Regions:
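Intrinsically disordered, low-complexity terminal regulatory regions
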Residues: 1-131, 137-141, 145-149
Protein backbone atom coordinates (compact mmCIF):
# COMPACT_ATOMS: atom_id res chain seq x y z
CA UNK A 1 0.00 0.00 0.00
CA UNK A 2 1.28 3.45 -0.92
CA UNK A 3 0.68 6.47 1.30
CA UNK A 4 0.57 9.72 -0.65
CA UNK A 5 0.31 13.11 1.00
CA UNK A 6 -1.87 15.22 -1.28
CA UNK A 7 -2.45 18.37 0.73
CA UNK A 8 0.82 20.16 -0.05
CA UNK A 9 0.28 23.75 -1.35
CA UNK A 10 3.22 23.29 -3.75
CA UNK A 11 1.65 20.13 -5.25
CA UNK A 12 -1.69 21.89 -5.64
CA UNK A 13 -0.05 24.88 -7.36
CA UNK A 14 1.94 22.66 -9.74
CA UNK A 15 -1.14 20.61 -10.60
CA UNK A 16 -3.17 23.77 -11.20
CA UNK A 17 -0.50 25.14 -13.55
CA UNK A 18 -0.26 21.82 -15.38
CA UNK A 19 -4.06 21.75 -15.73
CA UNK A 20 -4.05 25.29 -17.16
CA UNK A 21 -1.36 24.30 -19.66
CA UNK A 22 -3.38 21.24 -20.65
CA UNK A 23 -6.46 23.42 -21.11
CA UNK A 24 -4.65 26.08 -23.17
CA UNK A 25 -2.34 23.87 -25.23
CA UNK A 26 -4.12 20.51 -25.22
CA UNK A 27 -1.00 18.71 -24.04
CA UNK A 28 0.20 17.26 -20.76
CA UNK A 29 3.30 19.21 -19.66
CA UNK A 30 6.42 17.06 -19.24
CA UNK A 31 8.05 16.60 -15.86
CA UNK A 32 5.54 18.51 -13.75
CA UNK A 33 3.27 15.78 -12.39
CA UNK A 34 4.00 12.59 -10.47
CA UNK A 35 4.61 9.75 -12.93
CA UNK A 36 1.31 7.94 -12.26
CA UNK A 37 -0.72 11.15 -12.63
CA UNK A 38 1.13 12.11 -15.81
CA UNK A 39 0.42 8.66 -17.26
CA UNK A 40 -3.22 8.90 -16.21
CA UNK A 41 -3.69 12.31 -17.84
CA UNK A 42 -2.21 10.91 -21.06
CA UNK A 43 -4.48 7.85 -20.92
CA UNK A 44 -7.48 10.09 -20.27
CA UNK A 45 -6.67 12.20 -23.32
CA UNK A 46 -6.32 9.05 -25.42
CA UNK A 47 -9.80 7.98 -24.23
CA UNK A 48 -11.18 11.35 -25.30
CA UNK A 49 -12.04 12.40 -21.75
CA UNK A 50 -11.84 16.17 -21.29
CA UNK A 51 -9.90 16.99 -18.13
CA UNK A 52 -12.58 19.34 -16.82
CA UNK A 53 -15.67 17.33 -17.78
CA UNK A 54 -18.31 16.57 -15.19
CA UNK A 55 -19.78 13.08 -15.25
CA UNK A 56 -22.46 11.43 -13.18
CA UNK A 57 -22.62 7.80 -14.21
CA UNK A 58 -24.72 5.79 -11.81
CA UNK A 59 -26.57 2.70 -12.96
CA UNK A 60 -29.88 3.39 -14.63
CA UNK A 61 -32.16 1.21 -12.50
CA UNK A 62 -32.38 -0.53 -9.17
CA UNK A 63 -32.62 -3.84 -11.09
CA UNK A 64 -29.21 -3.15 -12.63
CA UNK A 65 -27.84 -2.35 -9.18
CA UNK A 66 -29.27 -5.61 -7.82
CA UNK A 67 -27.56 -7.55 -10.63
CA UNK A 68 -24.26 -5.69 -10.03
CA UNK A 69 -24.31 -6.42 -6.30
CA UNK A 70 -25.37 -10.05 -6.77
CA UNK A 71 -22.62 -10.69 -9.31
CA UNK A 72 -20.04 -9.24 -6.91
CA UNK A 73 -21.42 -10.80 -3.71
CA UNK A 74 -18.29 -12.89 -3.00
CA UNK A 75 -16.05 -9.82 -3.21
CA UNK A 76 -18.39 -7.71 -1.09
CA UNK A 77 -18.75 -10.39 1.58
CA UNK A 78 -14.98 -10.95 1.70
CA UNK A 79 -14.29 -7.20 1.96
CA UNK A 80 -16.89 -6.27 4.59
CA UNK A 81 -14.74 -7.16 7.63
CA UNK A 82 -11.88 -5.01 6.26
CA UNK A 83 -14.27 -2.16 5.43
CA UNK A 84 -15.72 -2.29 8.95
CA UNK A 85 -12.23 -2.33 10.46
CA UNK A 86 -11.09 0.64 8.36
CA UNK A 87 -14.26 2.59 9.13
CA UNK A 88 -13.69 2.01 12.83
CA UNK A 89 -10.09 3.21 12.58
CA UNK A 90 -10.85 6.28 10.44
CA UNK A 91 -13.69 7.64 12.49
CA UNK A 92 -16.55 9.68 11.09
CA UNK A 93 -14.53 11.83 8.70
CA UNK A 94 -13.08 9.11 6.47
CA UNK A 95 -14.40 7.55 3.30
CA UNK A 96 -13.90 3.95 2.23
CA UNK A 97 -14.91 2.78 -1.23
CA UNK A 98 -14.99 -0.78 -2.57
CA UNK A 99 -15.12 -1.12 -6.35
CA UNK A 100 -14.95 -3.98 -8.79
CA UNK A 101 -12.32 -4.40 -11.52
CA UNK A 102 -14.29 -2.00 -13.75
CA UNK A 103 -14.10 0.74 -11.08
CA UNK A 104 -17.82 0.49 -10.39
CA UNK A 105 -18.62 1.24 -6.76
CA UNK A 106 -19.91 -1.74 -4.76
CA UNK A 107 -19.80 -0.32 -1.22
CA UNK A 108 -19.33 3.09 0.39
CA UNK A 109 -18.66 3.66 4.06
CA UNK A 110 -18.22 7.11 5.52
CA UNK A 111 -18.87 10.70 4.58
CA UNK A 112 -19.42 10.74 0.80
CA UNK A 113 -21.65 13.80 1.34
CA UNK A 114 -18.56 15.85 2.28
CA UNK A 115 -17.32 15.54 -1.31
CA UNK A 116 -20.38 17.11 -2.93
CA UNK A 117 -18.96 20.61 -2.53
CA UNK A 118 -15.96 19.60 -4.63
CA UNK A 119 -18.13 18.43 -7.53
CA UNK A 120 -18.12 14.73 -6.66
CA UNK A 121 -21.86 14.16 -6.62
CA UNK A 122 -22.05 10.47 -7.34
CA UNK A 123 -19.98 8.51 -4.88
CA UNK A 124 -22.83 6.02 -4.86
CA UNK A 125 -23.42 2.33 -5.40
CA UNK A 126 -23.24 1.53 -9.09
CA UNK A 127 -21.37 4.68 -10.15
CA UNK A 128 -18.50 3.94 -12.53
CA UNK A 129 -15.17 5.67 -11.82
CA UNK A 130 -12.98 4.18 -14.55
CA UNK A 131 -10.35 6.39 -16.16
CA UNK A 132 -11.77 5.60 -19.60
CA UNK A 133 -15.08 7.15 -18.55
CA UNK A 134 -14.09 9.88 -16.06
CA UNK A 135 -10.42 10.56 -16.59
CA UNK A 136 -7.89 10.77 -13.78
CA UNK A 137 -9.35 9.92 -10.39
CA UNK A 138 -8.04 8.08 -7.34
CA UNK A 139 -10.16 4.98 -7.81
CA UNK A 140 -9.83 4.50 -11.57
CA UNK A 141 -6.14 5.37 -11.64
CA UNK A 142 -5.31 3.03 -8.75
CA UNK A 143 -6.97 0.17 -10.66
CA UNK A 144 -5.10 0.90 -13.90
CA UNK A 145 -1.79 1.29 -12.06
CA UNK A 146 -2.54 -1.82 -9.93
CA UNK A 147 -1.83 0.11 -6.72
CA UNK A 148 -3.68 0.38 -3.47
CA UNK A 149 -3.55 3.97 -2.26
CA UNK A 150 -4.44 5.96 0.80
CA UNK A 151 -4.76 9.70 0.16
CA UNK A 152 -4.41 12.06 3.11
Amino acid sequence: MTLIKTNSPKLHREARLAREKLHLEGEVPDGVLRAEIDASWRRSLSHGVHFNAKHELALESSASLDVLLASNRLLIDAALPAIDYLAERQGKEGLIILANSDATILAVEGRADRLKGSGLQDITLGACWSEAVRGTNALGTALVEALSLIHI
